[in-house]
């Protein structure tokens, strides 16, 4: 399913659509003057839950809240709301991106770090971990069972720090690096850093598995067709590499 955010002068509306483009009889209406403006929305893999980050004004200050909806169990509330995380629950952070990682875990990427949330009890979402980062957050990435951030490195010679987390907020690995990346993706159990002529690959043990340059412009780096391989995608060329 696909979610679409639409708005008029007084309210915003989040609609759900099937893959064939037909609309479902499910939507959420939010008054801009009260509920705020939806910054980002994410559906659970099963399509019955969604999480939305709202920005709103309170006494002239911009605030942020995260709202969980459940269209299978939230029938007691006409808006299908099952949980709300207010500014005090988020350390007054602003969540610009929210994502369901699986059916019972979600992550909010904020200007202060990451907030991991659980819907194991679907009628009562809870915060499982909050990662507050002092360093400037430069890039984020997420894919199923992993969420990652690249920040400035506060100490040491390397300018950047890469951190990867599980859905419950526990750390998978953390490492510093100096590679000058423009792209950052998580593919399976690999972390892909790349720029227009090279790439650098880490596994989930934090080990660098590959670093190399190419004679063509790199647009994207993907997991390969077979385990232990990656695909280097260019405009008119594709190269498959087997990792050692």
Positions of predicted regions on the chain:
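A broadly tuned "polar low-complexity/structure-edge" signature
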Residues: 6, 17-18, 35, 44, ...
């Amino acid at each position: 399913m696909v979610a679409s955010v639409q708005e008029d002068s007084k309210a915003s509306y989040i609609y759900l659509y099937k893959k064939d483009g037909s609309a479902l009889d499910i939507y959420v209406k939010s008054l801009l003057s009260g509920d705020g403006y939806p910054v980002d929305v994410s559906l659970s893999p099963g399509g019955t839950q969604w999480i939305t980050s709202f920005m709103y004004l309170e006494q002239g200050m911009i605030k942020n809240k995260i709202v969980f909806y459940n269209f299978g169990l939230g029938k007691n509330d006409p808006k299908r709301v099952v949980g709300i995380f207010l500014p005090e629950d988020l350390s007054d952070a602003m969540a610009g991106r929210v994502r369901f990682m699986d059916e019972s875990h979600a992550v909010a990427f904020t200007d202060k770090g990451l907030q991991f949330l659980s819907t194991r009890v679907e009628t009562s979402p809870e915060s499982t971990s909050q990662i507050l980062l002092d360093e400037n957050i430069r890039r984020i990435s997420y894919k199923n069972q992993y969420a990652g951030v690249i920040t400035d490195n506060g100490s040491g010679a390397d300018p950047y720090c890469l951190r990867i987390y599980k859905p419950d907020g526990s750390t998978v690995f953390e490492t510093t690096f100096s590679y000058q990346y423009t792209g950052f993706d998580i593919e399976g159990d690999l972390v892909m850093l790349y720029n227009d002529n090279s790439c650098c690959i880490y596994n989930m043990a934090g080990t660098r598995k590959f670093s190399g340059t190419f004679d063509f412009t790199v647009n994207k780096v993907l997991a390969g067709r077979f385990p232990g391989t990656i695909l280097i995608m260019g405009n008119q060329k594709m190269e498959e590499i087997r990792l050692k």
